[in-house]
A protein has these predicted regions:
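Catalytic and substrate-binding clefts that recognize carbohydrates or anionic sugar/phosphate headgroups
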Residues: 80-285
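A low-complexity, Ser/Thr/Gly/Pro-enriched, surface-exposed linker/loop concept
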Residues: 39-86, 122-127
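A generic structural motif
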Residues: 33, 43-45, 100, 223
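Hydrophobic/aromatic beta-strand elements that line small-molecule binding cavities or substrate pockets
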Residues: 36-38, 215
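Sec-dependent N-terminal signal peptides
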Residues: 4-13
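Boundary at the C-terminal end of the N-terminal hydrophobic targeting segment
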Residues: 19-22
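Carbohydrate-binding surfaces of carbohydrate-active enzymes
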Residues: 28, 32
Length: 287
């Protein structure tokens, strides 16, 4: 009987992580009921998805061929124990808590780059608390809910937002710990007051004369960046509501994002454009 018990325990831990070697994709069943998917794109680019559902929603950015998906394989190692899973490349290591899904990132020398990245469901009080702050700030900017996004069947244009965030039951937050003195840049042409965004709340949704060309990408002075892979309305609270936390507020109950790392900020920008594509340089006579 004991042998059968130990065999079942071993099978449980072996089945908690499935890796597709060629694509370098890791499917992780978290103990809190969420499903996580980690894709190693390069030595320094990781795509991470989290959902409370049995399957992951297809990104419209992927459906329409906007983001890169044909990544070349890189050497990856994976360790699994009772508490956490480690996914490592030649340059960086992700440690994932098997219960909560909290992720910490360090380089191969052991220097911690991001102490904690964690997905919060709508049940977390922060979703309502931060949502109220967002709705108060942008109360005069309500628009049809995703009405201009071709292919978004979940929210037809006839549906109107009652609040900027929509229903609190269908939101989520990606919570990222911040270091003292860490600074952030990016976001495109959005609801910004400064070029440096630490301490600001940004609205990532195109609205005429308000947020013209938002880009849900942020780069840190610590040489890492994050791209929120969504066409849904979202908000970046970069240490405004909580001084030591970067909260990405999504108006959906799942997350799809890229973490990227480099030895310099230009390296991180290079990673970002590798994901989204690079603009073509026009000939001299075009200027």
């Amino acid at each position: 009987m004991k042998k059968i018990y130990y065999l079942l325990v071993c099978l449980f831990f072996l089945q908690s992580v499935f890796a597709a070697g060629e694509k370098q994709i890791f499917d992780i069943r978290l103990q809190n009921g969420l499903n996580m998917n980690v894709e190693v794109c390069t030595d320094g680019i990781f795509r991470i998805r989290v959902t409370p559902h049995s399957t992951f929603s297809e990104s419209l950015m992927q459906r329409y061929g906007i983001i890169k998906t044909d990544w070349s394989p890189v050497p990856v190692s994976q360790k699994d124990n009772k508490q956490q899973i480690e996914v490592s490349t030649g340059a960086y290591r992700l440690k994932i808590d098997k219960k909560t899904g909290a992720i910490s990132v360090s380089d191969r020398k052991g220097r911690v780059i991001i102490e904690k990245v964690i997905f919060l469901t709508s049940a977390d009080p922060l979703c309502t608390d931060l949502g109220e702050v967002i709705n108060a700030k942008y109360k005069d900017m309500k628009v049809p809910n995703n009405g201009t996004i071709i292919g978004d069947d979940k929210n037809p244009g006839s549906m109107k937002d009652q609040a900027e965030t929509g229903d609190y039951k269908n939101v989520s937050i990606l919570s990222i710990s911040l270091k003292d003195g860490e600074r952030f840049y990016g976001g495109g042409s959005t609801s910004r007051d400064h070029i440096q965004h630490r301490g600001e709340l940004l609205r990532m949704w195109t609205t005429y004369q308000h947020t013209e060309i938002p880009m849900p990408f942020m780069i840190s002075s610590e040489n890492w960046g994050i791209f929120n892979n969504t066409t849904r309305k979202n908000f970046f609270d970069i240490g405004s509501y909580q001084p030591d936390v970067f909260s990405i507020y999504n108006t959906t109950d799942e997350a799809d994002f890229y973490l990227m790392f480099g030895s310099s900020m230009p390296d991180v920008i290079n990673d970002y454009t590798a994901i989204t594509g690079r603009t073509y340089l026009l000939p001299k006579y075009a200027y």
